[in-house]
């Protein structure tokens, strides 16, 4: 047996032991990681649902006050605008606003200027799964 093959076998054995050790650690800690990630995911879902409820309630009230029909897609557009504002893409915000019917642009501007919505959205972005 040559020196090269012996060194290769030793390196292979050490690699296997290291890999098995990592797998053992991952197996024992995986339940903790799983529980933590589920809790974070539930927290994100709760915050997201609260934002959606508020947007929808405000949209329905806006439609009633203005006497215009409720636009079901306005919730998704508001989400997109909140995300774009949070990321700082002002040019993209203008592009999206041009696609929205004129009677709903004031509503979307109000949503984007609402500091409470902005703080909730930034709180949502802080929770990472």
From Swiss-Prot:
UniProt keyword rRNA-binding present: no
CC annotations in GO: helical viral capsid
GO molecular function: DNA binding
Predominant cellular place of this UniProt entry's protein: virion
Compartment(s): Virion
Keywords annotated in UniProt: Virion
Function: Self-assembles to form a helical, filamentous nucleocapsid mesuring 400 nm in length and 20 nm in width. Together with capsid protein 2, wraps arounds the DNA and maintains it in an A-form. Capsid proteins probably maintain the DNA in A-form by non-specific desolvation and specific coordination of the DNA phosphate groups by positively charged residues. This certainly protects the viral DNA under conditions such as the extreme desiccation of its host.
Quaternary state and interactors: Heterodimer composed of major capsid protein 1 and major capsid protein 2.
This protein's name: Major capsid protein 1
């Amino acid at each position: 047996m040559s020196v090269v093959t012996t060194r290769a076998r030793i390196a292979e054995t050490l690699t296997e032991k290291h890999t098995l050790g990592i797998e053992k650690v991952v197996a024992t800690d995986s339940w903790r990681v799983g529980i933590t990630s589920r809790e974070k995911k539930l927290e994100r879902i709760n915050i997201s649902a609260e934002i959606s409820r508020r947007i929808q309630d405000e949209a329905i009230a806006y439609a009633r006050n203005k006497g215009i029909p409720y636009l079901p897609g306005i919730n998704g557009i508001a989400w997109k605008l909140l995300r774009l504002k949070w990321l700082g893409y002002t040019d993209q915000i203008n592009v999206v606003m041009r696609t929205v019917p004129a009677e709903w642009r004031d509503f979307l501007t109000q949503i984007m200027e609402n500091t409470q919505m902005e703080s909730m959205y930034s709180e949502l972005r802080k929770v990472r799964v």
